[in-house]
Swiss-Prot record:
ABC transporter domain boundaries: 3-224
Protein name: Biotin transport ATP-binding protein BioM
Annotated EC: 7.6.2.-
GO terms assigned for molecular function: ATP binding; ATP hydrolysis activity; ATPase-coupled transmembrane transporter activity
Organism of provenance: Rhizobium etli (strain ATCC 51251 / DSM 11541 / JCM 21823 / NBRC 15573 / CFN 42)
Gene: bioM
Membrane topology: Peripheral membrane protein
Keywords: ATP-binding, Cell inner membrane, Cell membrane, Membrane, Nucleotide-binding, Translocase, Transport
Length: 224
């Protein structure tokens, strides 16, 4: 993971969503915490190109995300409500959907679908309908759909939100075992407690960039 923020900021008219930020992001696990409306999601959307900077630029693995010719295929995004990003009713069909747009052969698609499900021990989900899945199973299905396309960087937005203890533990194990670089946006402080680097956002600016223990302490000061 090599992400460079070069005085990158976002404004909507007079409202500043994210103050200009200069930051280098490398490594395997980055936590992102902050109160609602602090700029966390805007920060993440700049990385995958869903939001364009109004000042400065963001470079992901050597490519400017603001360039209209650039498709940020290096970045996969798991939204806070994974059921909303699963498009097709059957899990294996949804995983295949993103691969068909890559121009892969039928055999290649089938191999990737089987491979990504096996990676998470989720073969039993292949023929299940998305609306029948538990919260944890939905997270796994969404992860499979994104990871099948081969992104090197994964952004997870509130991955344990509204999960029971069993499904929360499942998602925690998956995140811990991901070989891909991961940026985890969360209010769940236990989830990022072991991370070497955590970013804290407050009122549209970066308030702290520290190891987890120090960053969590700073967040608690802000939230008090």
């Amino acid at each position: 993971m090599n992400i460079q923020f070069e005085s990158a900021g976002v404004s909507f008219g007079a409202r500043v969503a994210l103050e200009p930020l200069t930051l280098a992001i490398t490594g395997k696990r980055i936590g992102v915490i902050g109160l609602n409306g602090s700029g966390k999601t805007t920060f993440a959307r700049l990385i995958n190109g869903l939001t364009k900077p109004t000042t400065g630029r963001v470079i992901v693995n050597g490519r400017d995300t603001a360039d209209e010719k650039t498709v940020v295929t290096d970045v996969g995004f798991i939204f806070q409500s994974p059921q909303n990003q699963i498009i097709l009713p059957i899990v294996k069909d949804d995983i295949a959907f993103g691969l068909k747009r890559r121009g892969l052969s039928k055999a290649e698609i089938e191999a990737r679908v089987e491979g990504v499900l096996a990676r998470f021990g989720a073969e039993a989900l292949a023929d299940r309908r998305a609306h029948e899945l538990s919260g944890g199973e939905l997270q796994v299905a969404a992860l499979c759909s994104v990871l099948a396309t081969g992104p090197g960087i994964l952004i997870l937005d509130e991955p344990t939100n509204q999960l029971d203890l069993k499904n929360r533990a499942l998602v925690e194990r998956i995140i811990a075992g991901l070989p891909e670089s991961a940026i985890v946006i969360t209010h769940d402080l236990e989830l990022i407690a072991g991370f070497e680097r955590v970013l804290v956002f407050h009122e549209g600016r970066l308030a702290a960039d520290e190891p987890a223990a120090e960053a969590i302490a700073r967040y608690r000061e802000i939230a008090a």
